[in-house]
Every structure is written in C-alpha cells, then in structure tokens.
Amino acid sequence: MNQNENDTSADTDTTEPLEADKVLIVYYSNTGTTESAAEQIAALTGGTLSKIERAEEYGDLEAEAEAEIQEGEQPEIITDIENLEAYDTIFVGYPIWWDEAPAMISTFLANNDFAGKTIIPFCTSASDDIGNSLHIFEELCPDAVIADGLTVNDATDIEPWLQDLGIL
C-alpha cells in the first residue's frame, strides 16, 4: 500500500519492536560514508547488512555515473541477499549524486518485489537533501510503504530518526 502524495510519513504508531531477523539494510557506498551509516543502522536494529555493488567497475566514475542517472539506466549489480522475501522492513542507503540516487539503486528496486514491505530510504550527501531522490521509490515500488527518509549528515541523527519511525 502506497501513501498518498499529501502524506509522506509511514504509520509509525507501532506497539511491537521490529523483529531483527526481518530487517534488511541494503546500501551502495562509493567512499565508505554510506557504509558507515548502514553499519550504524544495522547495529541499532539488529538487522542484516547487505552491500550493493556494480557488476562492472566504473572507468570514469563521474562521466559514467552521471550518464546512467540522466539516461535512466539500470546497470547490472551484485548483492548477497539470499531471501529478500523473508524481510518485512528494508532500509535502502546510497550517496546522493547529481541530486539523485546512483543508478544501482534503481536496478535493485526494479529487480525485486517489495509488495507489502516497508522501505526506509537513507542517504549521505555533503550538499543535497534526500528529497529529490525519493521519486524512484514511488515509481519502482508502488506496492510498498515508503517511510520517511533521512539525509545522514551527522551519525547522531540516526538513532533519533529510528525512534521517530517507531523502530526503536
């Protein structure tokens, strides 16, 4: 069930904590900043951590990554997720590039069925907010609940965000 455009927050009035074995934190990180945020989320939630990697390394990162985003490409990716169906809550993390998520995130979202799952986006960025990158979740995961995302500029923001979402 998708939320309507006027309601951007997920139902956070949970009475039971999430089951750690049903929480997945999947992320793409180029410099390690997003990876650090993902590791902190995993430590706080007890969830399973999984990295997204581009199957073919970039030759010219800046030119190729920007072209992928601008042209809506979905490059081949590698992940070590064995059974996505087993997870109810999926955090998806990425750096912001050209005000968007890297193309590998679109590949991950397009290649999996998120019907009935809760997706919680988070990003890292020195200058841009998560807002402009969120459209891919609505477009590629129409049957999922998309929770409020977070731009992680400070690691101390993560725990209060998880508390606001009703996860901790």
Where are these regions (language model features)?
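N-terminal beta1-alpha1-beta2 submodule of the flavodoxin-like/Rossmannoid cofactor-binding fold
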Residues: 2-92, 99-101, 106, 110, ...
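Short, well-ordered coil/turn elements that cap or connect secondary structure elements
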Residues: 20, 44, 114, 141-144
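Short, conserved loop/helix-junction motifs that constitute active-site signature segments
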Residues: 84, 110-116, 139-141
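Redox-cofactor binding/interface segments in oxidoreductases and associated redox assembly factors
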Residues: 92-93, 121
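Short Gly/Pro-enriched loop/turn and capping motifs at secondary-structure junctions
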Residues: 96-99, 114, 125-129
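Short, acidic/small-residue loops that bind anionic groups at enzyme active sites
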Residues: 112-123, 146
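Short, glycine-/small-residue-rich phosphate/pyrophosphate-handling segment
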Residues: 123-156
